[in-house]
Amino acid sequence: MFLRAVVLTLALVAVTGARAEVSPDQVATVVWDYFSQLSNNAKEAVEHLQQSELTQQLNALFQDKLGQVNTYADNLQKKLVPFATELHERLTKDSEKLKEEIRKELEELRARLLPHANEVSQKIGDNVRELQQRLGPYADELRTQVNTHAEHLRRHLTSHAQRMEAVLRENVDNLQSSLTPYADEFKAKIDRNIEELKGHLTPYADELKVKIDQNVEELRRSLAPYAQDVQEKLNHQLEGLAFQMKKNAEELKAKITANADELRQRLAPVVEDVRGKLRDNAKGLQESLAQLNSHLDRQVEEFRHNMGPYGDTFNRALVQQVEELRQKLGSYAGGMEDHLSFLEKDLRDKVNSFFSTLKEKENQDMPLALPEQEQAPGPLES
């Protein structure tokens, strides 16, 4: 069953990665995904999870991955799966309730802002234009950096391949001993250059989050005079907007990382082919090296092509989200699933809090405990 696999994965990720500081966002994504995908079958799936079979499988999994289960891992195992199950139960129970609360919140906001509808629409429009002006240079800079660092990677790797060709010409009678160190170094160079590429490009997502916070705060200040007695409700909607916009920034970072890792994977087979030909004749190896050069050019160009639109696509997504807020605060009633972003935000906040508690308890060398574990699950706060 899908949910069983997800929670097994959740436990494995947390346990095997606990010492490597696994990201709470990674765990929250797993929980949110199974909440989203299971839909109407969630209740039955959660009940199935609580059967003894799950405990047996998790015990076997922990033993397989960790050998002797230490106290920390054992406590984590006992806390994580119930926590994930409880979160899912809360999500399932509170989804419709929150949906109604958001509907009422928007109704009150629209009623309060209605006398100033034109001014509110104008302020949001101004904010959209400021957002476009802020983000435009980032899209251009990202594209420039992609081209610059991809070209640097291509030149660096091509230079190494050319050195291998030169060594081949000079050591035809002793290929394996002469070229094996170069082949090993080439693979290491690919890994280093890919990591450097990611290191140069992924910080853009964090910079964009800062711009998002600035833009949303300016929007809040510009709308505050029109929402004096419903400021808390406006703030809540703007928090939801910022959350959605930052999700786009995280997705941009994930796409950059995924494309860089895919480039690494596409280069690996040709490098392995060269290594495999070290035992063969010089002609076969020379052909493999020639293929390596052309393969490098082709794969780096494909990487640049794939990355090219990401900045502009990100900008359009953010502008669209601000425009959707303008529609929700106007006559448009809003989408049927507006509440889901708030539900997901609350989920991620709770997972972050849970992991903070785990870390604090571990640092204090105290038994792990889920806050309010003995109390009945309460509703997600909106």
Swiss-Prot record:
Region called 13 X 22 AA approximate tandem repeats, residue ranges: 33-330
GO biological process, one term: lipoprotein metabolic process
Gene Ontology terms for molecular function: cholesterol transfer activity; phosphatidylcholine-sterol O-acyltransferase activator activity; phospholipid binding
TM regions (residue ranges): none
Disulfide feature: none
Primary site of residence: secreted
Renumbered residue ranges of the record's region Disordered: 362-382
Keyword match Cytoplasm: no
Sequence repeat residue intervals: 33-54, 60-81, 82-103, 115-136, 137-158, 159-180, 181-202, 203-224, 225-246, 247-268, 269-286, 287-308, 309-330
Gene Ontology cellular component annotations, sorted alphabetically: chylomicron; extracellular vesicle; high-density lipoprotein particle; low-density lipoprotein particle; very-low-density lipoprotein particle
Localization of this protein: Secreted
Signal peptide: 1-20
Keywords of the record: Chylomicron, HDL, Lipid transport, Repeat, Secreted, Signal, Transport
Similarity comment text for this entry: Belongs to the apolipoprotein A1/A4/E family.
Free-text comment about domains: Nine of the thirteen 22-amino acid tandem repeats (each 22-mer is actually a tandem array of two, A and B, related 11-mers) occurring in this sequence are predicted to be highly alpha-helical, and many of these helices are amphipathic. They may therefore serve as lipid-binding domains with lecithin:cholesterol acyltransferase (LCAT) activating abilities.
Description of how the protein assembles with itself and partners: Homodimer.
Function comment: May have a role in chylomicrons and VLDL secretion and catabolism. Required for efficient activation of lipoprotein lipase by ApoC-II; potent activator of LCAT. Apoa-IV is a major component of HDL and chylomicrons.
Protein name as annotated: Apolipoprotein A-IV
Organism: Acinonyx jubatus
